[in-house]
């Protein structure tokens, strides 16, 4: 499957909100993807746009995802839906990302079929479970506390080191508070793929920020 090959080579994963308060999602996504983002995921929970306009309704979310889908396909990248298997199916998403408390994997698979499915993990037991279950990739963290997930303890780089020591062939991404300044520490801990949020979404030049991160990841191999 072409999408699986794209996942195998993916190193830079971006989570973004819908940027409703700025109204620049299409331009932002295009710049970030041109800069080297491999996977772009919509996650609007807790965003400035949600605080101002309220939660995205399903119809609105599908419209936002259409913008991301268009940009991702023009740049040969993958686009992901957070949590909602029904939205992933309706939007024809490449990827569904599940948290620990989201829909059970078996149910999600019945809805999205053989689409790429990922899983969040926050301790070594969850990492081991993700290695063994029918997910295509998993995320490990948070490496540092982050406002995206307020109140969630950060297991830190020790969990990244422990995950790297497992030597799994399944793709996995470090996540949580990662930016260009902290990325060398994450790479030293053994990760070769990362998820970022504010490192690109809050950048004055999202394309340049993505390009810098992608270059560092590429150099690390």
From Swiss-Prot:
Sequence intervals crossing the membrane:
none
Which pathway does the database say it acts in? Cofactor biosynthesis; thiamine diphosphate biosynthesis; thiamine phosphate from 4-amino-2-methyl-5-diphosphomethylpyrimidine and 4-methyl-5-(2-phosphoethyl)-thiazole: step 1/1
Return any one Pfam family short name.
TMP-TENI
To which species is this protein native?
Mycolicibacterium vanbaalenii (strain DSM 7251 / JCM 13017 / BCRC 16820 / KCTC 9966 / NRRL B-24157 / PYR-1) (Mycobacterium vanbaalenii)
Q: Any idea which UniProt keywords this protein has?
A: Magnesium, Metal-binding, Thiamine biosynthesis, Transferase
Q: EC number(s) of the enzyme?
A: 2.5.1.3
Quote a single Gene Ontology cellular component term: cytoplasm
Q: Which InterPro entries match?
A: Aldolase_TIM, ThiamineP_synth_sf, ThiamineP_synth_TenI, TMP_synthase
Provide the residue positions that the database annotates as binding 4-amino-2-methyl-5-(diphosphooxymethyl)pyrimidine. Answer: 41-45, 82, 120, 149
Q: Output this protein's name.
A: Thiamine-phosphate synthase
Can you tell me which residues bind 2-[(2R,5Z)-2-carboxy-4-methylthiazol-5(2H)-ylidene]ethyl phosphate? Answer: 146-148, 177
Return one Gene Ontology term, BP aspect.
thiamine biosynthetic process
In Gene Ontology terms, what is one molecular function of this protein?
Answer: magnesium ion binding
Q: Which cysteines are joined by disulfide bonds?
A: none
The record, for SUPFAM superfamilies, names:
Thiamin phosphate synthase
Q: How is the cofactor bound?
A: Binds 1 Mg(2+) ion per subunit.
Output the CDD domains linked to this UniProt entry. TMP_TenI
Q: Which gene encodes it?
A: thiE
Q: So what family is this one in? A: Belongs to the thiamine-phosphate synthase family.
Query: Cofactor(s) for this protein?
Result: Mg(2+)
Reaction(s) the record says it catalyses? 2-[(2R,5Z)-2-carboxy-4-methylthiazol-5(2H)-ylidene]ethyl phosphate + 4-amino-2-methyl-5-(diphosphooxymethyl)pyrimidine + 2 H(+) = thiamine phosphate + CO2 + diphosphate; 2-(2-carboxy-4-methylthiazol-5-yl)ethyl phosphate + 4-amino-2-methyl-5-(diphosphooxymethyl)pyrimidine + 2 H(+) = thiamine phosphate + CO2 + diphosphate; 4-methyl-5-(2-phosphooxyethyl)-thiazole + 4-amino-2-methyl-5-(diphosphooxymethyl)pyrimidine + H(+) = thiamine phosphate + diphosphate
Q: Give residues annotated as binding Mg(2+).
A: 83, 102
Q: What does this protein do?
A: Condenses 4-methyl-5-(beta-hydroxyethyl)thiazole monophosphate (THZ-P) and 2-methyl-4-amino-5-hydroxymethyl pyrimidine pyrophosphate (HMP-PP) to form thiamine monophosphate (TMP).
